[in-house]
A protein has these predicted regions:
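Active-site-adjacent "subsite" loops/lids of carbohydrate-active enzymes
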Residues: 47-63, 120-123, 134-177, 314-316
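Catalytic domains of carbohydrate-active enzymes, especially glycoside hydrolases
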Residues: 71-96, 176-181, 248-256, 320-328
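Aromatic- and glycine-enriched glycan-recognition loops and surfaces
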Residues: 64-80, 107-128, 204-208, 279
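Aromatic-lined carbohydrate-recognition surfaces of secreted/lumenal glycan-active proteins
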Residues: 59, 131-141, 183, 202-242, ...
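Short, acidic/polar
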Residues: 65-79, 160-175, 233-249, 306-321
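Substrate-binding cleft of secreted/luminal carbohydrate-active enzymes
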Residues: 252-283, 288-353
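Aromatic-lined carbohydrate-binding surfaces of glycoside hydrolases
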Residues: 83, 87-118, 130-163, 179-203, ...
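Boundary/entry segment of secreted carbohydrate-active catalytic domains
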Residues: 25-74, 78, 297-299
């Protein structure tokens, strides 16, 4: 009788856990294609990691990567033009953990949105020759901020121990699913203060997280930083976001400055995609020796009059290459890279056979 009761209680616990997971999972209508690849018997689940140098690729949301038609089109075009990397969200700007995470806190706070079969997707991308970069949004996290009840919501600050341990646990789990690199984004404080005061304490908090990540992971780590972080004044630690180029560069393997000309305040920088990328990269390379792999603007915003969108993208590519960038990545939040393919086609024609 006692044994039967224990069995019944065990089955009841499993049933309740299943209900809890189903309650936090999105409906099928919310997921374009929740499982697009399966693990083949003849494919190694964790192939040898390739070098992080010389990577050129595009960014995809988890939802875009889970759409098999969209993904296959992007992979085909990427291969055609010699791109060799794919960046995919594993934790996005909504605070969603985009695969079937087993991290207890992710499940407890309802952050798990299993859009991707991440392990299977990594295997398929490796099979097709792509280096896989997992993008993890760190301190902009509406779900965690709401759970913690912090006044900085939707941000959690880098000084919040629970936010640090949560994100480290996710990164460690993602590493175990076979990705080649983890890229931390929103690895900063909110941009909510004047430039000028001493923000050394904020810089130290950001670098403390990165040091812990570096110590706990075996894959390369990269960091997305504001484009302005590359400019000389940043060396004084006077930026409220807490990103100090020299400090970050001492820890990580790659820095990815987001060099979108449209996001600069100065009109002359907005109007000159080539000059803006070239000058900003040269400033950064004069300060640090870490590989700089910039994000280039592949979304249509503030395109100068008289310049086509593909020409705008191509100008950035030329500047990145001339400045000595160690590869580059393209950002379009909708994964619409039609103008990028036009730009790369123009580049091929200019170079000739």
């Amino acid at each position: 009788m006692k044994t039967s009761l224990l069995v019944f209680l065990g089955l009841l616990a499993v049933f309740l856990l299943s209900l809890a997971f189903l309650a936090q999972a999105p409906s099928p209508q919310e997921i374009p294609n929740p499982k697009i690849v399966t693990q083949g018997e003849d494919v190694e689940p964790h192939p040898p990691k390739s070098s992080f140098y010389g990577k050129r690729g595009v960014y995809l949301t988890a939802y875009a990567a889970a759409n098999s038609a969209k993904l296959n089109e992007i992979l085909a075009q990427s291969a055609r033009f010699g791109l060799n990397a794919i960046v995919i969200d594993v934790k996005n700007n909504e605070g969603e953990v985009c695969y079937l995470s087993q991290v207890p806190k992710a499940r407890t706070i309802g952050a798990v949105r299993p859009v991707l079969d991440l392990a299977g997707l990594v295997i398929e991308l490796h099979r097709r020759g792509f280096y896989v970069i997992a993008r993890q949004v760190v301190f902009y996290d509406p779900i965690l901020a709401k759970h913690l009840g912090v006044p900085t919501s939707p941000w959690v600050l880098p000084t919040e121990a629970e936010a640090v341990s949560y994100n480290l646990a996710i990164a460690q789990e993602v590493e175990g699913l076979g990705v080649d690199e983890i890229q931390f984004d929103y690895i900063r404080f909110p941009d909510d203060g004047p430039i000028g005061p001493d923000y050394s304490a904020r810089c130290q908090a950001v670098e403390s997280f990165l040091s812990q990540a570096k110590a706990s992971l075996s894959v390369p780590i990269s960091v997305d930083v504001y484009g302005r972080v590359m400019w000389p004044w940043n060396a004084q630690k006077i930026d409220p976001i807490g990103q100090h180029l020299e400090g970050i560069a001492r820890i990580v393997d790659v820095v990815s400055p987001m060099l979108y000309p449209s996001h600069f305040v100065e009109p002359e920088l907005k109007a000159d995609p080539y000059g803006t990328v070239l000058r900003t990269m040269r400033h950064g390379k004069a300060r640090v020796e870490v590989p700089l792999r910039p994000y280039l603007q592949a979304f249509s915003m503030a395109i100068p009059t008289g310049m086509s969108f593909p020409e705008y993208i191509l100008a950035q590519i030329k500047a990145a290459e001339e400045s000595g960038a160690d590869g580059y990545l393209f950002w379009n939040p909708r994964a619409d890279y039609s103008s990028l393919w036009e730009a790369l086609n123009l580049a091929q024609k200019e170079r000739g056979p």
